Amino acid sequence: MPSCLSCLVPGQTRRRDEDDGSKKILETPLHPDAVVPPDNVSAGEFIFEILRAKPTHVGQIDSLTDAEDTYGQMLERSVRTALWLRSRGIESGDVVALCTHNHFDTVTPILASLYCGSTAAPWDPGMNCQEIKHMVRISRPRYVFCNEESACTVLVALKECKNDAEVVVFGYHSGCASFADILKPFTAEEIDEFECSKIDERSEVALIVCSSGSTGLPKGVEHTHRTIMIQFGIVKLLNLRNRTSAVFSSLYWISGVMGVLVCIAGDMRKVIVPVVDEDICARVIEKYRITWALMGTSVLVRLIYSGALEKYDVSSLKTITGGGGVVSLEAFAKLRAILPNALITLGYGMTELGGAATFQLVECEQNSCGKPIYGVSCKILDTSTGGILGAGEVGEICWKSPCVMKGYRNNPEETADIIDAEGWLHSGDIGYYDKDGSIYIVDRSKEMIKCRGNQIAPAELEGIIARHPGVQDCAVVGKPDKIDVERPVAFVVRRGNSTTVTEDEIVQLVASQVSERKQLRGGVRFLDALPVSPSGKPKRAVLRNMLLKEI
């Protein structure tokens, strides 16, 4: 069986000399002993061989029922699903969408898609119809696997988009194929003789994962089979083989889908947690003696401050991997007091980078997000001149990585905006690195609000509020919050200074139009006028400062 699990190994970040003699580009090269992912092996072939080699290994445990799922069972169901897809005429490039909660078969259509050389597109089951319609337009799926709760919304969205994708339901829904039924028609001989499709693993798109756009609607980020294979290196990097794991993240996020696949690559026992709640998470860690937990930093911070980690015995945790936001020094200290011997790896990542770009493998400088992982380079650009800056100088952070996305799905313009001609990805984040190569984030040049691990675009909420007849002007910004990172707050100017528009009215208006994760959790503030720039744009920094004074 081919191995790529040591492509990320400990080593030394260095600064590369530029023409003027200064060392301005951070890079962490591959270790000489690293095993580079093999050519001509797809992620589907790699996972298929792992599952086939250990049929009795318990790969999944349902935390609700204690039921166990072996690699052999996972392989059979995923092969049966792949055979069904082939019987329906699936081809390379076809999209298999997934819209469901976490359960044994959440990963099955993804594995089947990888075997067939097609493209898997996980969607958030909490999306409303407008959001799913947007995903349909981006990914243009040929097949959609969804749970019973999402079926009606998915069917309406497909119909309104004039998309005739076949819908398969985990459970039952009138007019749709049942997942249990599509597994039945195939013989043991067909399963034994199954082979994965041969593809070009460097160019074929394996995943379309959502990333927030400046309008609030997500973009479809394309990643190849090669990206998945390289990300499997985290098993070696963090010594995760044969761990008992829990992925407290939806497959909608890059961390969730990569985390689930990494669990298979590392021969782990993954405990499935259908609902991410602080008390449930801590109870699962205690009951199943979880040794590796992967979660967004928003979940981690809520766990720390909820008291759940003290309520349950979580001493089994050897490694916690978190990303997607900042963990304050206060929160980190509380976590370290609870788990003094655990390896806490917090890092910086982007969906467009295929996951993590940095990791703190040791206690780095305070507030640092760590150093570039292997094969990743970083430079800081002056936001005015575009020139490369040195250590301690603040500018836009740019990245080069073997895991950088192929592009945004059906969106070459925005792809060209974020990846330049030399292959550098412009993150939109503002920061610097110190003399030791540790990277610090100081601001976001984007206006996105980060709340509970979700990216919320002010423009989307502002567009909804502005449609209220009693609203003359509005702006939405994030208010810093110890638990949620930020909470969206709407600043509203009433039309004609009318007093008839209430906070509850605005909050309910937004709630009726967007998903639960985009609510105005910070409330509404009424002003006589918004502070604006000479061009008429809201001065968001001024509004944020007003909120800071409330803290």
What is each stretch, according to the model?
Residues 265, 290-295, 304-366, 377:
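Gly/Ser/Thr-rich phosphate-binding loop
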Residues 58-103, 107-111, 128-133, 137:
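Conserved AMP-binding/adenylate-forming core of the ANL superfamily
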Residues 2-16, 87-88, 115-185, 496-499:
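Structural core segment of the AMP-binding/adenylate-forming
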Residues 170, 515-537:
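AMP-binding/adenylate-forming catalytic domain of the ANL superfamily
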